[in-house]
């Protein structure tokens, strides 16, 4: 994690992030718990894929590790994107140049809190649109994450294309996108229980200019 973090929940900040493509906002654990507690039965015997989440620091990954046995998950996969030798979770660390992922099966003595020595590196950057990430997507049953804000429409389109079940937490303004609203109208996707209410905000690295 960055040495310091700040909370951002202002729409102006999110619009700036979309424009500048600095849109990796990290969802707080409390907000994840608040929403996902309504869907616990859907994770039983499922392979869960968090395809926009650093397995070392992601709160989505942490939530599923904490609740792995209770939810009776079959397998958890968490993968993240690394751009231009830049680790999004540590603004001073430029040693990592490839995306990476981690798989957890809930076996006895299996590592559940991976370090940089435990992760598996992609050949590429780990973008959710890459073949490597899509290969992981194909083997998964349900996707849970907070996708990149500037790529929200493309992200949703991919999940629909591969006929994946998903639960994503993001900016409520996304429902105004034509592509997203059409899916809601056709009853192919639904709004969450909280629908943007009661969300504490997002954690962003201190070095981001918001």
Task: Annotate each PLM feature.
Residues 1-210:
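Class I S-adenosyl-L-methionine-dependent methyltransferase catalytic core
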């Amino acid at each position: 994690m960055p040495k310091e973090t700040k909370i951002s929940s202002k729409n102006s900040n999110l619009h700036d992030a979309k424009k500048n493509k600095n849109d990796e906002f990290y969802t707080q654990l409390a907000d994840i718990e608040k929403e996902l507690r309504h869907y616990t039965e859907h994770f039983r015997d499922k392979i869960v894929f968090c395809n926009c989440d650093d397995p070392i620091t992601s709160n989505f990954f942490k939530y599923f590790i904490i609740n792995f046995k209770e939810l009776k998950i079959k397998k958890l996969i968490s993968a993240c994107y690394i751009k231009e030798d830049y680790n999004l979770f540590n603004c001073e660390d430029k040693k990592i140049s490839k995306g990476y992922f981690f798989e957890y099966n809930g076996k006895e003595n299996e590592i559940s809190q991976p370090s940089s020595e435990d992760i598996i590196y992609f050949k590429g950057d780990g973008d959710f649109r890459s073949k490597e990430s899509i290969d992981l997507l194909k083997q998964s049953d349900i996707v849970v994450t907070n996708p990149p804000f500037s790529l929200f429409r493309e992200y949703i389109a991919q999940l629909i294309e591969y006929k994946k079940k998903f639960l994503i937490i993001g900016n409520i303004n996304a429902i105004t996108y034509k592509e997203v609203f059409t899916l809601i109208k056709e009853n192919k996707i639904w709004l969450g229980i909280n629908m943007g209410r009661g969300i504490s905000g997002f954690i962003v690295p201190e070095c981001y200019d918001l």
